[in-house]
UniProtKB/Swiss-Prot annotation:
Protein name per the record: UPF0178 protein TERTU_3490
Organism: Teredinibacter turnerae (strain ATCC 39867 / T7901)
Family label: Belongs to the UPF0178 family.
NCBIfam families hit by this protein: PRK00124.1 (NF001095)
InterPro entries: UPF0178 (IPR003791)
Pfam family, one: DUF188
Domain of life: Bacteria
Length: 147
């Protein structure tokens, strides 16, 4: 099983948590981004650079992910594709996307996108907090424990 990271927008603190976990467990960890991101010199950690372009990293992850893999992403449509392939999707805030919650998340995303395109300022997400980091690490450890 592989941990895939939608790394273009992944917070540094989350990447560091992932690096520590990959070192500890030996699980394959692949960061996918359209820019080069430094990774530790560890055999099971790699960086896959994709061409510049809208959703290029998302498309590459969706193409490569298989059942049982874990994908770290904030991108709701990518999370839906991952779930449809029987893999797991986890946000950097520690929210596990599931078949039970992904449709509601997609609907909310689409609604907010419609609001923004009509000129309504919806604001963005709050800064990542220590409790978000802990929630992420806890969910990651749960997945790793099942290996």
């Amino acid at each position: 099983m592989t941990i895939w990271v939608d790394a273009d927008a992944c917070p540094v603190v989350v990447r560091e948590i992932l690096f520590r976990a990959a070192r500890r467990t030996g699980e394959p960890l692949v960061l996918v981004a359209n820019q080069s991101i430094a990774t530790p010199s560890v055999p099971n950690i790699s960086m896959l650079q994709v061409p510049q372009g809208y959703d290029a990293a998302d498309d590459e992850i969706a193409r490569r992910v298989v059942a049982g893999d874990l994908v770290i992403t904030q991108d709701i449509p990518l999370a839906k594709e991952v779930i449809d392939k029987d893999a797991l999707a986890l946000s950097p805030r520690g929210e596990l996307f599931t078949r039970a919650n992904i449709v509601a998340r997609l609907n909310m995303r689409d609604f907010l996108e419609t609001m923004r395109s009509s000129g309504v300022h919806t604001g963005g997400p709050s800064a990542l907090s220590q409790s978000d980091n802990q929630a992420f690490a806890k969910q990651l450890d749960k997945w790793l424990a099942k290996r």
